[in-house]
Swiss-Prot record:
Residues covered by region (Disordered): 27-51
Statement: the UniProt record of this protein carries the keyword Membrane: yes
InterPro entries, per the entry: Lysis_col
Functional summary from the UniProt entry: Lysis proteins are required for both colicin release and partial cell lysis.
Primary location: membrane
Domain of life assignment: Bacteria
Pfam families xref list: Lysis_col
Membrane topology designation: Lipid-anchor
Species of the source: Citrobacter freundii
Any one Gene Ontology BP term: cytolysis
Any single Gene Ontology cellular-component annotation: cell outer membrane
Subcellular localization(s) per the UniProt record: Cell outer membrane
Name assigned to this protein: Lysis protein for colicin A
Chain coiled-coil ranges: none
């Protein structure tokens, strides 16, 4: 049972890492810090809030 839980956690970490790499590629050089997907969304909302 513990092995299954560990495998699920590892898969989740790998998926999150893959998403972060995709975000860096989309920005074209990592101008935006790839700390998490939420930062990109929050930065987008800030740009709309402050014209």
């Amino acid at each position: 049972m513990k092995k299954i839980i560990i495998c699920v956690i590892l898969l989740a970490i790998m998926l999150l890492a893959a998403c972060q790499v995709n975000n860096v590629r989309d920005t074209g050089g990592g101008s935006v810090s790839p700390s998490s997907i939420v930062t990109g969304v929050s930065m987008g909302s800030d740009g709309v809030g402050n014209p």
